[in-house]
Design a protein with these regions (language model features):
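Glycine-rich, highly charged phosphate/nucleotide-binding loops
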Residues: 57-66
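CheY-like receiver
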Residues: 67-71
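Generic detection of long, well-ordered alpha-helical segments
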Residues: 64, 137-140, 188, 192
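Short, solvent-exposed cationic patches
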Residues: 54-56, 202-203
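Metal-dependent phosphoesterase core characteristic of DEDDh/y 3'-5' exonuclease domains
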Residues: 2, 12-19, 23-53, 72-182
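Short, surface-exposed, low-complexity cationic segments
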Residues: 186-203
């Protein structure tokens, strides 16, 4: 069983306002769970515009420390951009898998947000009624569908996905400089001197 976790926050620095999870068991999405959470700071207007969770909606909700034990119980936790969720959550007893890192390994060059990958891979999943993208439970279903696709495409085991998640991300496409948007492999063939220059000028 792999447990997909998603959080919505007060902003990029954290402050959880919502947590949710679903489990993937034998390729099926089961056991949905979600909680609104009272944050430890004000919700930024930018974050509120994205997830539409207001101060009034969370004012009387429990703290994250009070609800997080309900999300324990898996050997593996999965998130899209797992480093963010790991940073804002209390410690979770298990290994972490990042679908963003796995997707970059499998499909370099595709936009890496979970919704962009979901659409480009032409995936389909029944999401909860009344929710929308950037609500935690909705996004858990999107990430779960992506995880199932990754596992079916790659054949990777959970432990292999943990290993890949722990490795430094490989640059497959230049995001800077005169070759911005070009695959590294193409530049290596056409202009190997540029790669040598880059390596020699790394700080």
């Amino acid at each position: 069983m792999l447990r997909i976790i998603d959080t919505e926050t007060c902003g990029l620095q954290g402050g959880i306002v919502e947590i949710a999870s679903v489990d993937v068991v034998d390729g099926k999405i089961v056991n949905p769970m979600s909680h609104l959470v009272r944050p430890d700071r004000p919700i930024s207007p930018q974050a509120m515009a994205i997830h539409r969770i207001t101060e009034a909606m969370v004012a009387d909700k429990p703290w994250i420390e009070d609800v997080i034990p309900q999300y324990y119980g898996s050997e593996w936790y999965v998130a899209h951009n797992a480093s963010f969720d790991r940073r804002v959550l209390p410690d979770m007893p298990g290994e972490w898998i990042c679908t963003m890192k796995l997707s970059r390994r499998l499909w370099p060059g595709i936009k890496y947000s979970n919704m962009a990958l979901y659409k480009s891979r032409k995936l389909s999943v029944q999401t909860p009624a009344g929710l929308h993208h950037h609500r935690a439970l909705y996004d858990c279903y999107i990430t779960a569908a992506l995880l199932i696709d990754i596992m079916q495409t790659s054949g990777w085991t959970a432990d292999q996905m943990v290993d890949i998640t722990g490795r430094p991300a490989l640059l497959t496409t230049f995001t800077f400089g005169k070759y911005r948007g070009k695959p590294v492999s193409e530049v290596a063939e056409r202009d190997p001197g540029y790669l040598r220059w880059l390596f020699n000028n790394l700080d």
